[in-house]
Amino acid sequence: MLGWVQRVLPQPPGTPQKTKQEEEGTEPEPELEPKPETAPEETELEEVSLPPEEPCVGKEVAAVTLGPQGTQETALTPPTSLQAQVSVAPEAHSSPRGWVLTWLRKGVEKVVPQPAHSSRPSQNIAAGLESPDQQAGAQILGQCGTGGSDEPSEPSRAEDPGPGPWLLRWFEQNLEKMLPQPPKISEGWRDEPTDAALGPEPPGPALEIKPMLQAQESPSLPAPGPPEPEEEPIPEPQPTIQASSLPPPQDSARLMAWILHRLEMALPQPVIRGKGGEQESDAPVTCDVQTISILPGEQEESHLILEEVDPHWEEDEHQEGSTSTSPRTSEAAPADEEKGKVVEQTPRELPRIQEEKEDEEEEKEDGEEEEEEGREKEEEEGEEKEEEEGREKEEEEGEKKEEEGREKEEEEGGEKEDEEGREKEEEEGRGKEEEEGGEKEEEEGRGKEEVEGREEEEDEEEEQDHSVLLDSYLVPQSEEDRSEESETQDQSEVGGAQAQGEVGGAQALSEESETQDQSEVGGAQDQSEVGGAQAQGEVGGAQEQDGVGGAQDQSTSHQELQEEALADSSGVPATEEHPELQVEDADADSRPLIAEENPPSPVQLPLSPAKSDTLAVPGSATGSLRKRLPSQDDEAEELKMLSPAASPVVAWSDPTSPQGTDDQDRATSTASQNSAIINDRLQELVKLFKERTEKVKEKLIDPDVTSDEESPKPSPAKKAPEPAPEVKPAEAGQVEEEHYCEMLCCKFKRRPWKKYQFPQSIDPLTNLMYILWLFFVVLAWNWNCWLIPVRWAFPYQTPDNIHLWLLMDYLCDLIYLLDITVFQMRLQFVRGGDIITDKKEMRNNYVKSQRFKMDMLCLLPLDLLYLKFGVNPLLRLPRCLKYMAFFEFNNRLESILSKAYVYRVIRTTAYLLYSLHLNSCLYYWASAYEGLGSTHWVYDGVGNSYIRCYYWAVKTLITIGGLPDPRTLFEIVFQGLNYFTGVFAFSVMIGQMRDVVGAATAGQTYYRSCMDSTVKYMNFYKIPRSVQNRVKTWYEYTWHSQGMLDESELMVQLPDKMRLDLAIDVNYSIVSKVALFQGCDRQMIFDMLKRLRSVVYLPNDYVCKKGEIGREMYIIQAGQVQVLGGPDGKSVLVTLKAGSVFGEISLLAVGGGNRRTANVVAHGFTNLFILDKKDLNEILVHYPESQKLLRKKARRMLRNNNKPKEKSVLILPPRAGTPKLFNAALAAAGKMGAKGGRGGRLALLRARLKELAALEAAARQQQLLEQAKSSEDAAVGEEGSASPEQPPRPEPPAPEAPAPEPTAPEPLAPEAPAPEAPAPSSPPPASQERPEGDKDAARPEEHPVRIHVTLGPDPSEQILLVEVPEKQEEKEKKEEETEEKEEGEEARKEKEEE
């Protein structure tokens, strides 16, 4: 039934061997299968069933007789009772019954949660003596049981093999362990002289670990031999079962209460082995166990195998191991019975976390001090027995390994000292954190003494030679700010208090694996030390690591990761003398590198059946998160992350293995890559610093220079949202595609019909369509007003043409109706300052207005009376009431007409004509009323009735006279009314006509009055006639060009916004083209436009003169100006046209240049815009960016003007002039002719003299040209960006006597005259140079060196003249220097001003 457990559990590597149990008097039984590292699921399974092959250890437990040391050690290990069970126990029971009872007891211990005993005395004792369960390699269940019981507990167990009373005592003991106990050190333990020598005081309560977990992991293992005295090196127990010591008899009620409490919290759940062993969630400690178990098997070949650690076994070890100042001893691996070598486990310090937990539990254990004293006594006795066994075994093994031990002592001596120092530092650091002083300080002192004693014992233990199975997790300290180096030190400390050889190897291994990117350096040394070291040190190291992680919580996921690491591990065969060490990171692959205060401890891997030495080292804190410090370790960690290895801990089996070599290569390559990256980054930083330095320097030199970060960027203008801009083009495209016309066989595209949509609302002030509509309405109104009286008075409407009259009448009515229903209903209006465009509101506004009433009256349907009274035109008189449309049309038309006064004159004339029209109609009606031709006054009916009547009306209204006198009363009244109308009304209209005409000529009148006043003023002061003529000319030109004398008068009444709009429309197109203002803020230019003044200059007027103070800048609006220069100041240097600007240098006042540098004269009538310096400064205050830009441009222009002129260097200057005496002699010789000439030599000399004279003349001319050019450049600086137009200038006259041909001429006859005409191929040097006034375009190419060749005095002799202008580089350099000087001076001036 229980056979499946055997298949699951690991098997021992060799045949059962005997352990030293002769003292106990029990026969050695076959060794149990090693189960030190069984996972939690194995322990759970063992609770249910145990393989029959594993004998019970109960009898051996009973047979064990513990001395005072043994009891002391057992007293030290009450929390480690299960650790003893986890260790390999020998087959101590010869009877099946004892085996079954032992198995049942173990199962119960596994099931029942075991609290961690936190009593300080027991912890110290466990740290000092490492309970016999841990120190004796062949420790039996009896010893395991006495770990926490009184001295009589083990004899009673030896006598009573039955588990009943023992089980009850064990329950009581474990209950006491779980309950808080007051920290008290038993005097028996204090009396022991070897307590302090065995190890440092455990600062933290290592007894908090569940002993249940230990019991679950080791149901039966070989029992250890009797302990040896403490004075000698205590050999650690061989792999045995560290059976939990029975607790002293306590209150059963407390036990039942505890059981009920634990059952309520949680029941242990079975765990699948494949997942690394999961422990109960209620386990007080879930830290992984790091154990170094030594198999005392055959020493032929040792394999380094990475085994999985059982968490329950590890927790048991945490309770019993003495690692990190904890009283717990690590579990002993299963030992072969043939070589029952007991290896003692050294105590280690407990991490700070465990100490804190101990403190919390110690506060709860105040009421159990007496019970602790009894357990302390038992532990002391157990420890004494274990020490005796250890010493005996050390003596036997010491003789064999003296030589090897001495060598290893020399190598590891230094390491031991370092370990001791670190242990002391850690103990001191932890001691500071402990809030409880007295008891804890004493425990630390005892722990340190124990460590020293253990080190002495380890010297002899190192001599032992046996195969080692090293299953340890080097758990780094769980400090938050711990670096990689501190982790390696902690790992080295794991074995420091144990066998120093092994500890040194483990320390070197951990340090090298962390700091050297886990290279293989020192691997052989570590392996040899591990192989040569005794199991005592190894077990101690594992115990320390167990203690480090003992107070940490263990998660199921972490256990699964540990089993995955187990799957990757494999044993490597090695020799006995040089065992190979396989080091792998069990969980670094899945753990982040960030610190965590309470990291879960690693899960102990199960032992492999192979005989091997395996060191499982988690490179990072297993299950913990590390927070790294910025040090070299960070770079190493970065290299690890970059390397192909998934884990930061590299596994190696031999120093020369290919894997290690590859790792070294990868580390080297990544290091080189990192160095290259760092170099690149440094170079980039240097470059950035240089750029910043240059910017700061430039800013200090020139304050106008601003960086992109400092200069405020103008906020972009907010654009109005465009309604669906993308949809319209698409629609337009569709419309274009649709408009195709097919005609016959051709298909061509036609223009689409324009779609006009009637507006929803109409602006009556600006809508031209509405004005056009009003024009039609006024036409209809005039039809009615003019023709209704005619049709009524004159007989022009007859039955033959009545239909035409009616057609026109009703057409006018239709226009009226459309105006009311369509247009007037859509007119916008203003209400409360808002323009109302709502249709309903507009309709309501029109309906409520006076105009609507008049429109309704004019459309009264009086035409229906035609049916009764006939067609009478007087019935249409209401149509004339639409006079409001007429007046509105007049206003709208005047607003859009450029010359409104013309329309006003026409309209006034129309009023006069209409009044005459009405009078003529009335006169015909009066004549018809009395009878045509009846009297002399009436119309006689001859000729055109309308024309005759109209003429009579004109004579009557104008009161010209000459009309016939009225005879009847009717005629007298009618004529009186006509006269009255003509005198009163008609005179008013004539006066209005005068006003209209006067208004039309008001400007001209003002111009005349101003001119007359000015002429009167000049005559009064007797101004010269020339000046008066120029003034009159100015008046006339200004009036004709502008239509007014002063534009500013018109702008005064307008608001600023309107003035700006007008100025933009008039002047912006000109100012925006000025190169000086390009790039400036647009708003600045707008503000500047309002400050511009328009001035007209007459021909030859001086705009500015050289040397005067410049306060204005000029922009040419129309006309031209000429820049004059030269020696006389009258040479035209350049002509500026419209759009050019000059005077800006003086205006900006850069470098103190406020004086004019040239004369500027108006060429013809010129209209200039003038910008005053004061106005510009006021504007630039609000635009600092534009100010800086303008100043830069002005400096550049000034620098160009002040450029040094190119000076030609004459390397071979011409010869000096001929002395006068020599000239006289030549003249005399010339007169002598051929006699003194010697074949024409004198003629040649005469020609040479003429050439020299020509050279002198050319030099003088060149001087004059250079002066002219200098003045011209100064004038060009004034012009700014003007487009120069060089007028044609007369070139300087060529020298009269150029040089002769360069080739030697033939000898001339004496009578031959001197050659007057020079050869064209050999002009003199001056003739080669073009005048400086010519532009560069006249010279196609400028050579750096100019060479001129002339004839010498001798025909065969030639003179070489070379001109070398200055180099361009030197020019640029000089320009830069001058620019820097100017900028520096300007910056200083500004600072002084500020």
Curated annotation (Swiss-Prot):
Residues 493-508, 529-554 have a biased composition (Low complexity). Residues 1-95, 112-253, 271-675, 699-732, 1265-1394 are annotated as: Disordered. Retina, testis, kidney, heart and brain. Residues 671-681 are annotated as: Calmodulin-binding CaM1. GO terms for biological process: calcium ion transport; monoatomic cation transmembrane transport; positive regulation of gene expression; potassium ion transport; retina homeostasis; sensory perception of smell; sodium ion transport; visual perception. Residues 959-962 are annotated as: Selectivity filter. Residues 356-387, 409-418, 452-464, 481-490 have a biased composition (Acidic residues). It is found in: Membrane. 3',5'-cyclic AMP binds at R1156. Its main location: membrane. It catalyses: Ca(2+)(in) = Ca(2+)(out); Na(+)(in) = Na(+)(out); K(+)(in) = K(+)(out); NH4(+)(in) = NH4(+)(out). PROSITE patterns: CNMP_BINDING_1, CNMP_BINDING_2, CNMP_BINDING_3. Residues 1261-1267 are annotated as: Calmodulin-binding CaM2. Residues 300-312, 336-355, 388-408, 419-433, 1329-1345, 1364-1376 have a biased composition (Basic and acidic residues). The rod cyclic nucleotide-gated channel is a heterotetramer composed of CNGA1 and CNGB1 subunits with 3:1 stoichiometry. CNGA1:CNGB1 channel binds Ca(2+)-bound CALM1 via CaM1 and CaM2 regions of the CNGB1 subunit; this interaction modulates the affinity of the channel for cNMPs in response to intracellular Ca(2+) levels. The olfactory cyclic nucleotide-gated channel is a heterotetramer composed of CNGA2, CNGA4 and CNGB1 subunits with 2:1:1 stoichiometry. The cyclic nucleotide-binding domain (CNBD) comprises three helices and a beta-roll of eight beta-strands from CNGA1 and CNGB1 subunits. Upon cNMP binding transmits the conformational changes to the C-linker domain of the S6 helix to open the ion conduction pathway. The ion conduction pathway consists of S5, S6 and pore helices from CNGA1 and CNGB1 subunits. It contains a central hydrophobic gate that opens upon cNMP binding. CNGB1 displays an additional charged arginine gate below the central gate to regulate ion permeation. Belongs to the cyclic nucleotide-gated cation channel (TC 1.A.1.5) family. CNGB1 subfamily. This is Cyclic nucleotide-gated channel beta-1. It comes from Bos taurus.
